[in-house]
C-alpha cells in the first residue's frame, strides 16, 4: 500500500524533528502504507540536545535515527517560535509507546521488549497481553552481560519482531538499538527510558493537568529534588531560546 501521510520536519540546534500535530497523526504516519515503519524512534527534549552537544557519540546516534519527535514541551515551544504557524504538538514518549502497543495489538504486529527489572518486565508483558492482546514474541530484562548482546540480537532477528522497544535510558538504549539494527533491520526501534515502570504503576507520572500545562518537568523536580542539578543545566537551552539560537 502506498504511503500517503505527509508530516513536516523542523530543524532545532542541528537536529531534524518530525512535527506531528497530534498523537493520531503520529500513529497514522508510523503505520502508513499498511505496515509499521522501519527505523528508529527517538524522543527529543532539551536535556538530550544539550547532552548531545557535549557527547559526539550520542550526537551521531541521534543523527542516524530516522524518526526524532518533540517529546518535551521545550521542543514544541522552540519549533513554534522558530517557525511561526507551525501546527505541532507534544508527543510524550510514554503516551506514544502505549499508543504503539495498542495499535500493534489490534493489528497483530509482533513486538519484542528489552529492558527494566525482571519483575517489572514480567508485569509489563502480562498487562500488554491482557489489556491490548499484544503479540509479544520475546523479551529480555535490562540485566544482561556484554557477551550476551549478540545472542540477544539473534533472538530478536529469529523472532521476526516488527517493533522493538528498549527501556535502558539514554544513551545505552540508543547504542543498543543501533547495534541491533545491524543484525535485524526489519523493525521499528523505540527507546522508552522508564516507561515500563510508569506503565506498571511503579513510578507515578505527573497528573494530566500538569502535563497539559507543560509542567511535567516541574512535577518531577518537586517529586525528586535530586533532579535540581539536571534542571539547572537547562538554563543554557533557555538562553538559546531567548537569543534566537535554535
UniProtKB/Swiss-Prot annotation:
It is an enzyme of class 2 (transferase). CDD domains: Glyco_transf_WecG_TagA (cd06533). It holds the Pfam family Glyco_tran_WecG. It comes from the Bacteria. GO terms for biological process: enterobacterial common antigen biosynthetic process. The keyword Transmembrane does not apply. It catalyses: UDP-N-acetyl-alpha-D-mannosaminouronate + N-acetyl-alpha-D-glucosaminyl-di-trans,octa-cis-undecaprenyl diphosphate = beta-D-ManNAcA-(1->4)-alpha-D-GlcNAc-di-trans,octa-cis-undecaprenyl diphosphate + UDP + H(+). Its EC number is 2.4.1.180. InterPro entries: UDP-ManNAcA_Trfase_WecG, WecG_TagA_CpsF. The keyword Mitochondrion does not apply. Keywords: Glycosyltransferase, Transferase. Pathway: Bacterial outer membrane biogenesis; enterobacterial common antigen biosynthesis. GO terms for molecular function: lipopolysaccharide N-acetylmannosaminouronosyltransferase activity. Belongs to the glycosyltransferase 26 family. Catalyzes the synthesis of Und-PP-GlcNAc-ManNAcA (Lipid II), the second lipid-linked intermediate involved in enterobacterial common antigen (ECA) synthesis. HAMAP family: WecG_RffM. This is UDP-N-acetyl-D-mannosaminuronic acid transferase.
